[in-house]
Structure formats: structure tokens, C-alpha cells
């Protein structure tokens, strides 16, 4: 902990002002990151468009589209395809969130 002497009457105040400024900057950047994370989505699809899944930032399935070709798939294969694409989309959304948060977590948010 720093100690300030009588010869440095404003040193403590200056340090505190700088600290408050830094904290405010981190708060603003955190809010911006939160807003960006809230808009993250990721979509994965089969090549033929039979199945299209979309997830949010947490990897939660938010949309599932089954094209005409999906009717040709056996039920077990369709279920496996939905699960596989959901995992792929969730990995993509997690990577997006990580890229958004990296500047805040690197070097203590400086």
C-alpha cells in the first residue's frame, strides 16, 4: 500500500482520480461487451439445407429449420444431425463470446 507524505498532498488525490477513471473505463467497456454478447448468434446447416440450427451466446437453441430434404432422413439420423449442428453452432457462439471478452480479461482489463 502506498503512503503519501505531507510533501505530496495531492499525490493521493491524483492516484484516486486516475483509479476512478480507470474503473469507469473498465465499466464502460464491460457494458459494451455485454451488449455485444447479447447479440451473438451462430448458425450451422447441412450442405443441402435439410437442417439449419441457430443458437444464442449461451449455446441455447433459438431456431430450428427443417427443409424439404429433412423429410427424407430417417428420424434417428435427423435427430443426430440436429444435435451435431447444435454443438457446432454452440462452439462458434462460444468462440465469438471469447473474442468479445478477451480484451476485458487480458492484462486485468487494461
Give the ranges of each region predicted by the language model:
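Acidic, negatively charged sequence signal
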Residues: 1-45, 52, 65, 69-72, ...
Amino acid at each position: 500500500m502506498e503512503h503519501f507524505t505531507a510533501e505530496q498532498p495531492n499525490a493521493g488525490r491524483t492516484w484516486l482520480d486516475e483509479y476512478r477513471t480507470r474503473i469507469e473505463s473498465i465499466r464502460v467497456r464491460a457494458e459494451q461487451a455485454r451488449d455485444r454478447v447479447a447479440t451473438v448468434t451462430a448458425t450451422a446447416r447441412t450442405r443441402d439445407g435439410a437442417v439449419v440450427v441457430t443458437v444464442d451466446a449461451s449455446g441455447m437453441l433459438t431456431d430450428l429449420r427443417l427443409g424439404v430434404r429433412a423429410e427424407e432422413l430417417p428420424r434417428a439420423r435427423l435427430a443426430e444431425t440436429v444435435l451435431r449442428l447444435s454443438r457446432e453452432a454452440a462452439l462458434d457462439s462460444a468462440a465469438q463470446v471469447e473474442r468479445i471478452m478477451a480484451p476485458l480479461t487480458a492484462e486485468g482489463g487494461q
